[in-house]
Amino acid sequence: MNPIVKSFEYGQHTVTLETGVIARQADAAVLASMGDTTVLVTVVGKKEADAGRDFFPLTVNYQEKTYAAGKIPGGFFKREGRPSEDETLIARLIDRPIRPLFPNGFKNEVQVIITVVSVDPQIEPDIISMIGTSAALAISGIPFSGPLGAARVGYIDGEYVLNPSVAQLATSQLNLVVAGTAGAVLMVESEAQALPEEVMLGSVVYGHDQQQVVIKAIAEFKAEAGKPTWDWTAPTQDADLVAQIKELAEAGLGDAYKIQVKQDRYAQVSVVKAATKEALLASNPSIDLREVDNLLGSLEKKVVRGRIIRGEPRIDGREPDMIRALSVLAGVLPRTHGSALFTRGETQALVTCTLGTERDAQKIDSIMGERTNRFMLHYNFPPYSVGETGMVGSPKRREIGHGKLAWRGINAVMPSAAEFPYSVRVVSEITESNGSSSMASVCGTSLALMDAGVPIKTSVAGIAMGLVKEGDDFVVLSDILGDEDHLGDMDFKVAGTRDGITALQMDIKIEGITKEIMDIALQQAYGARVHILNVMDQAIGSHRDDISDHAPRITVIKINPEKIRDVIGKGGAVIRALTEETGTTIELEDDGTVKIASSNGEATKEAIRRIEEITSEVEVGRIYNGKVIRIVDFGAFVNILPGKDGLVHISQISDERVANVSDHLELNQEVAVKVMEVDRQGRVRLSIKEAQTKETAAE
């Protein structure tokens, strides 16, 4: 075995790429390391495409092995199971920038598997996974227009930071991942603390500039370790068939794309395509209908893009910077804690907000350590939203990705646990979809949170931008339709407040997207965002003054941390009795913070009263109403507070001589006692006769 190794410095870390030792039967295998975080990336491609396939079957599988962090998996089977949400998101992060780099017409199946085999808790594995994938594809021989570079950018104290550590990210105002080739940015994914447009654009440019060292290193690695490129040629088009289809369908498709209602437009497009196929079959019964479908799709794209470049109205009649009609409703469901219905044209989201206690928060145990999510956002995309039938069940990759994007857009304005001690779950049900449903989820979430009384810092709105570019001519589109997303060159989603951007996601399908074009898109998105925020604020401009009557109310009190064990009791007996008898949920923290949750105010008051009793200190000289719990020869033990007992000596029962304690006291008898002394060991000395004397004097 002769390993080929390439090492280079990248930000704070040394990156190492190695091949030739592990997984030698794959088309390519690279062991990629950044510090102590190491991933094994393998690539396998089929030399022949399956007959009849009309799409590119690329699969990216990202898997984190618990042994990488020196852990044994939990659960009964003690082995890794289905992909976690984090694994799904990173798989999408890798897939998005590499997919456009495969040539048009390439239909051979390709599978990329990334396995995390070692992890440094301060170095996230996603960036090195992207670098390793780029290197493996570069040396595999599979047609691929790489290399691809990747970088994470932070923003700390007004300075950009390349590949910040996990600790640095905790103080960073920005967490941005950018991937691209030597000449183009292809993908951006970010979360930010309402940063200005110029800072966000600067971070993209900075990240792309810094990753050139990666691209150069992979090119050198390929020169030394790369396999010969496959002998593959793109399928040629039949020029006569292209001309026939243009003559038969161009005018009809042009008319169909003037129909503004999506379902009616699709129906007419289907009519035009069916008539075209019928005419072609009449002249040539053996014609390949799959090729006809592909050429019709290309013609469709050309028709729509041509109209936009010529300055004609868009598919639904709008100008490039126009936003579709908005409808904003808050408080639409009677029993939810918060709800909103946000409609933008033919895209609609029904969003609900549910409040819970800290124990309702999501507990996540990953190879990067344990963490808790108090704010959850789940996105559902049922098939009826686009007028189709389909499987309904667990969320797919796309739904997980869109939900996380919306979460990033909102997270920056969420209150801290000290400000709002609730767990929050938001669910966005996409009930209609024609473009930008994730950004509709951002808007709907902002509204639902306010309706629920969650004190978010300010409203948040999201907008999806598009681009059509032909040569030096380009048009930036605001609030794109589904067709404009599919037929355009860029999908550019921006969420934010009036003050700045909270989330930015960008996927670019072509090269030649300049800094100037991105700047125009960001400025146009800002205008669209402010317009949407104005409409949203008319419906609900700030959070409700109070939470829903149906939501649990959390009351926070403080106790002496040394008294926590008294509230818990032996084996949890005291706190269990408290919760069962009052019907409340009680959570204790190490600093003495007690959170009591209940939708019944009287139950909360009773729980507080009992906790205060348990944690209160015994006062010398005070009279308590106690209960006799044990009788002995020399006196009786009386419980005066929960968990606190004292001794009434036989001499302190009565002014008269007491020969037998049982003649004066019995078990469970309630008596008034005065605290005479609490010694250094915490033992309490009580007196019944002194209490009676004091009460008599008071009378």
Curated annotation (Swiss-Prot):
Q: Which NCBIfam families match?
A: polynuc_phos, PRK11824.1
Protein name, per record:
Polyribonucleotide nucleotidyltransferase
What Gene Ontology molecular-function terms does this entry list? 3'-5'-RNA exonuclease activity; magnesium ion binding; polyribonucleotide nucleotidyltransferase activity; RNA binding
Q: Quaternary state and partners of this protein?
A: Component of the RNA degradosome, which is a multiprotein complex involved in RNA processing and mRNA degradation.
Entry function: Involved in mRNA degradation. Catalyzes the phosphorolysis of single-stranded polyribonucleotides processively in the 3'- to 5'-direction.
Organism in which the protein naturally occurs: Shewanella baltica (strain OS223)
Q: Which family does it belong to?
A: Belongs to the polyribonucleotide nucleotidyltransferase family.
Its catalytic activity?
RNA(n+1) + phosphate = RNA(n) + a ribonucleoside 5'-diphosphate
Query: Which keywords label this protein?
Result: Cytoplasm, Magnesium, Metal-binding, Nucleotidyltransferase, RNA-binding, Transferase
Entry's Gene Ontology BP terms:
mRNA catabolic process; RNA processing
Q: Where does Mg(2+) bind?
A: D485, D491
Required cofactors, per record? Mg(2+)
What are the residue boundaries of the KH domain, all occurrences included? 552-611
Q: Which GO terms describe its cellular component?
A: cytosol
Instruction: Please state the protein's primary subcellular location.
Output: cytoplasm
Localization per Swiss-Prot or TrEMBL:
Cytoplasm
Q: Which InterPro entries match?
A: ExoRNase_PH_dom1, ExoRNase_PH_dom2, ExoRNase_PH_dom2_sf, KH_dom, KH_dom_type_1, KH_dom_type_1_sf, NA-bd_OB-fold, PNPase
Spell out the Pfam families in the cross-references.
KH_1, PNPase, RNase_PH, RNase_PH_C, S1
